[in-house]
């Protein structure tokens, strides 16, 4: 079997998914109501009128959330190795070691740039 024939089903699936997503966006943009107003430009406050001045959300919370996601994904990638560590041998260990070292270097760079400092 030719290599491309093995992926025809996947390519069709991705193509249909992209088509449906783009079609939904286009239909919403073309048929949706376009009534900009002052109320739509105000920040959402759980259905209540905004009280007081609007304050910017500190970016540091966003950075902490991104770091959490980064290391959460790391654990998700390391989980299969932890389950089958005995069967992977030296090459599996070296692959996981390289992956962990790469993430550790990224963590050190973030630390060096001061991302972890709370101002």
Curated annotation (Swiss-Prot):
Pfam families assigned: Oxidored_q4
Name the UniProt record assigns to this protein: NADH-quinone oxidoreductase subunit 7
EC number(s) given by UniProt: 7.1.1.-
Function: NDH-1 shuttles electrons from NADH, via FMN and iron-sulfur (Fe-S) centers, to quinones in the respiratory chain. The immediate electron acceptor for the enzyme in this species is menaquinone. Couples the redox reaction to proton translocation (for every two electrons transferred, four hydrogen ions are translocated across the cytoplasmic membrane), and thus conserves the redox energy in a proton gradient required for the synthesis of ATP.
Enzyme class: translocase
Main location: membrane
Organism: Thermus thermophilus (strain ATCC 27634 / DSM 579 / HB8)
Keywords recorded for this protein, A-Z: Cell inner membrane, Cell membrane, Membrane, NAD, Quinone, Translocase, Transmembrane, Transmembrane helix, Transport
Location(s), subcellular: Cell inner membrane
Top-level division of the source organism's lineage: Bacteria
Oligomer and partners: NDH-1 is composed of 15 different subunits, Nqo1 to Nqo15. The complex has a L-shaped structure, with the hydrophobic arm (subunits Nqo7, Nqo8 and Nqo10 to Nqo14) embedded in the membrane and the hydrophilic peripheral arm (subunits Nqo1 to Nqo6, Nqo9 and Nqo15) protruding into the bacterial cytoplasm. The hydrophilic domain contains all the redox centers.
Membrane topology: Multi-pass membrane protein
Family of this protein: Belongs to the complex I subunit 3 family.
GO molecular function annotation: NADH dehydrogenase (ubiquinone) activity; NADH:ubiquinone reductase (non-electrogenic) activity; quinone binding
